[in-house]
Amino acid sequence: MVHHIVMWKFRPEVEETDKARRKAEMEKNLSSLVGKIPGLLSASFVKEPIASSTHDMALVTTFEKAEDISAYSIHPEHVKVADTYVRPFVTERACLDYQD
């Protein structure tokens, strides 16, 4: 199993009142990719990190093998979701992948 964790910060121009809606849209659409993209076994979304966190939200995914992360990143369904619900609203991205 390979785990892929991605964290983001909102762009400064995203209104505080809009952040909860944006997080909900990200969660719904990123989670919907399970079953659509080969090798993607699970996805969970962190909408409410604790105060000591450096990022506003995170996606935690599990894949069968490391190669599946590369295929996921360019899969048309993932690109569509990222281009519509994630990239327009985030400014900073951090990623950590690990195998257990």
Task: Kindly give the residue locations of the regions a language model identified.
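Short S/T/G/P-rich N-terminal loop/turn motif that feeds into the first structured element of a domain
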Residues: 1-56, 64-74, 97-100
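C-terminal structural segments of small proteins and small subunits
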Residues: 66-96
